[in-house]
């Protein structure tokens, strides 16, 4: 399962802030080139189907519809005593998530499960207005988590009616990152449709100021600090060195040469350069996996440790420090050694839709981020909701409603719900906005000591640490109980 699929939440660079205020870039957002091509060795067998959904589930006058894509794999499904594992698609092409959520495929036989992967509206092929879907805010008005959850509910009802044996089977929602948030909210809003949910790396408390805005970047910094004694200090010092050199034409040329950039730097590009570097450190924290895998380029096991091999001394000369930064960046962008230069427009992956997530980040999904340069290794950046709101209005003609998600889903007041697993990797910066303590006996937290961004949803690997192996066993244990309780209650 390629690492490319797992940056499910990145950042929305509205403006030129170098410390990356939220853009949960769409995970899809990241801009690679074309849609991802799965590794043939892990390609999955499934049927591609479409279901006609209402554009607006919450009004009666709008009769427009669109086709939602979904994937079904039923190799291990049993009509008697089986279950349905339902992936709540997030901000990207559903085929990508299908091919990169190996956990579901690994447990399908044990749970006698049909696998269903539902594409999120406005992503992949599930475009309500075709090529006009992102034309303006009027066309994007139906891109909300509430509408997406209603799509999932309607699709499950359709499956129960049209697949013999599906009706009367327990459905479990599974998702990671934004998809994990949706899985949790799906169980909260539609408990009569799904018996439980696995919400992996789901930062449901990153919203509405429920956690300190600097928590995310502190965790990123701690990942680097733990991987090398002077690693984070070297990165922190690099910002001033970049500023110093960018003040002259010769300095800009030196920066271009030392960092082996594909195009010459100008003073106007310095914020872009800094944002690109900062985003690289963030992405490394999310994909800090215990085995080698393929992201933009091949990545080694524990890539931050590899990065920190080059960042051992912050007190070297400016030129040497930048040369070390280049070597560190090359771990992420050129580990294979095949790239002739580094392109600062290249970030994460392209299979996710940046335009769709950009709109969501400007409406419902408002996640405050900040840095102070003391508790973290980034330049100071203050969260400014007014500026953020104005930037959103300039881009989309809408202003965010930062408190709406708390109103809709309860914020931290969710103890009345049940049967939700919140799993978080302690290395994952999104864990700062996740549920990391049990709320009740049935709202449980599983913390993965050596886990990065939803490592537990990845396919089994011989190099998996014991912490993720245990987490998966616990997750399956809870699911089996939900399934058993379901069948016990209908007898």
Swiss-Prot record:
InterPro entries: AB_hydrolase_fold, Peptidase_S28, Ser_carbopepase_S28_SKS. It catalyses: Cleavage of a -Pro-|-Xaa bond to release a C-terminal amino acid. It is found in: Lysosome. The keyword Disulfide bond applies. Its EC number is 3.4.16.2. Disulfide bonds join 213-370, 231-308, 262-341, 362-392. Residues 18-43 form a propeptide. Its main location: other. Glycans are attached at residues 99, 315, 334, 343, 413. The active site is at residues 177, 428, 453. One of its GO terms (biological process) is regulation of thyroid hormone receptor signaling pathway. Keywords: Carboxypeptidase, Disulfide bond, Glycoprotein, Hydrolase, Lysosome, Protease, Signal, Zymogen. Cleaves C-terminal amino acids linked to proline in peptides such as angiotensin II, III and des-Arg9-bradykinin. This cleavage occurs at acidic pH, but enzymatic activity is retained with some substrates at neutral pH. This is Lysosomal Pro-X carboxypeptidase.
